[in-house]
Regions:
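STAS-typified acidic loop motif
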Residues: 2-34
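Proteins with a high burden of low-complexity, intrinsically disordered sequence enriched in S/T/G/P/A and R
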Residues: 2-6, 10-13, 37-39, 44-46, ...
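Conserved catalytic submotifs in the C-terminal HATPase_c
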Residues: 12-13, 52, 84, 108
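Residues at the C-termini of beta-strands that transition into short coil/loop
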Residues: 21, 107-108
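Amphipathic alpha-helical interaction surfaces in cytosolic regulatory modules
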Residues: 26-101
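Short acidic-hydrophobic, aromatic-tinged amphipathic segments that line or gate anion-handling sites
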Residues: 102-106
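A charged, well-structured terminal subsegment
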Residues: 108-127
Length: 127
């Protein structure tokens, strides 16, 4: 099975949503890497990976997501996961590659979290 990657429009607040579906494994991680490289080249401050349609993730897929998270964190950004399927969630639980506080049941929950983070940062800057 192939991977599908759908990139949504960049929001004015610098948040980007990317839907990932299918299988993320040794045969498909390169495509996700390529697409995320394009996304991260923009002025993205927060990235929501919507994994509702992701059926399988291998260690290569975990590395791909971790790489994007690391690149974004290096410039003060945040990567969160939303809508993880139980079998995919189990992989992240086992490898502990993504803190549980950065995995959400829905895109709306992830967006609310990112809004809180940004408001908190702005509030601290004003003090």
């Amino acid at each position: 099975m192939a991977i599908s990657v759908r990139i949504h429009s960049l929001l004015p607040n610098g948040s980007q949503r990317v839907e990932v579906g299918g299988r993320l494994d040794t045969h498909t991680y390169g495509e996700l890497d390529d697409r995320l490289t394009l996304v991260l080249a923009a002025k993205v401050q927060s990235l929501v990976l919507d994994l509702a349609q992701l059926d399988y993730v291998s260690s290569a897929g975990v590395r791909s997501i971790f790489r994007a998270r690391k690149l974004l964190a290096a410039r003060g950004g945040t990567l969160v996961l939303a809508n993880t399927q139980p079998q995919v969630q189990k992989v992240f639980d086992i490898v502990k590659a993504v803190p549980l506080s950065e995995i959400f049941r829905s895109v709306e929950e992830a967006d609310a979290y990112l809004d809180r983070i940004q408001k908190k940062i702005l509030a601290n800057d004003e003090d």
